Design a protein with these regions (language model features):
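SIR2/sirtuin NAD+-dependent deacylase catalytic core
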Residues: 2-282
Length: 282
């Protein structure tokens, strides 16, 4: 009988096992607020918002979780997002007492509802979401400590992982590949790979570069601009990422997918045109 390939999927519990509470949800969220109050994120926002203001946004928005669960904003949720709303309510069927009880990706849904309720500032949605993403990535990165967890994993863990022909991970860190010295499949992106929006060798990055939208990445915060997939609507982010990998065929399918236009990095026709002109870009 031929040897069957064995695969493994690694999640955040793997990091918690070796890094402890520092990588649990509540500690990550607490770290964002601590870092904000220490003015760590001034460079991310070009000094347009203070650390105390960022901290207050988190504590105020957390109260929206209870209101969303209570049905206060049901009327403004689009029909296409009803399943997301019901899933949120099912998971938060109790009253939150602290801001750090809100799950990482659930912050994006709360923020989304906030902008639905305040439609007059809807143009700020993308930049606000991007700011949240980058702060969360920084808090997970934990001054780079997360990238050193492999040093504490030891030979038994290395031998165990080498017993799998393919290793998949939901985590952004690069500990497993540093430990086993083999490629690892990052399903949600990783800290060492630049985001498509910032990489001029990708379709999205090329279009931004052509428009002069390139962003200067602050020194020491490079990890905040990686290709991590971070969103409350998981189905959307995977469909969009997959479509980019499939080129024009994928982009055309994306146009008929029913995904709200706000999730696209640019109008579909612009993406298709850029791909035709530069088929080497993905």
């Amino acid at each position: 009988m031929a040897n069957r390939e064995k695969s493994i999927l690694i999640g955040n519990g793997f990091n918690i096992n070796f890094g402890g509470k520092a990588y649990t949800n509540d500690y990550i969220i607490k770290r964002i607020v601590f870092n904000a109050r220490a003015n760590r994120y001034e460079a991310l926002f070009s000094g347009e918002i203070s650390g105390d203001e960022i901290a207050n946004i988190f504590t105020r928005l957390a109260t929206w979780a209870n209101d969303i669960s209570a049905g206060k904003y049901d009327a403004i949720i689009p029909d296409t997002e009803r399943p997301i709303l019901e899933d949120f309510k099912a998971r938060y069927n109790w009253e939150l007492s602290h801001y750090y009880e809100v799950g990482l990706e659930d912050w994006f849904f709360i923020l989304h509802v906030y902008f639905l309720q305040n439609a007059d500032i809807a143009d700020n949605w993308s930049s606000a979401k991007q700011g949240f993403e980058r702060m969360m990535l920084d808090a997970i990165y934990n001054d780079g400590d997360i990238q050193s967890l492999y040093k504490d994993m030891g030979k038994p863990v290395k031998r165990w992982l080498l017993g799998f022909s393919k290793v998949f991970t939901l985590n952004y860190d690069n500990n497993v590949e540093d430990l086993i010295k083999r490629p690892v499949f990052h399903l949600h992106g990783d800290f060492r790979t630049l985001a498509n929006s910032e990489d001029p060798h990708t379709l999205w990055g090329y279009m931004r570069h052509q428009k002069g939208d390139n962003l200067e990445i602050p020194a020491g915060l490079e990890h905040c601009f990686c290709n991590a997939l971070f969103d409350y609507a998981g189905e959307y982010k995977y469909k969009i990422a997959y479509a980019f990998e499939q080129g024009e065929r994928g982009l055309k399918a994306l146009e008929k997918s029913g995904i709200p236009l706000q999730y696209f990095p640019a109008p579909i026709e612009d993406l298709i045109r850029a791909h035709r002109e530069h088929p080497d870009l993905v």
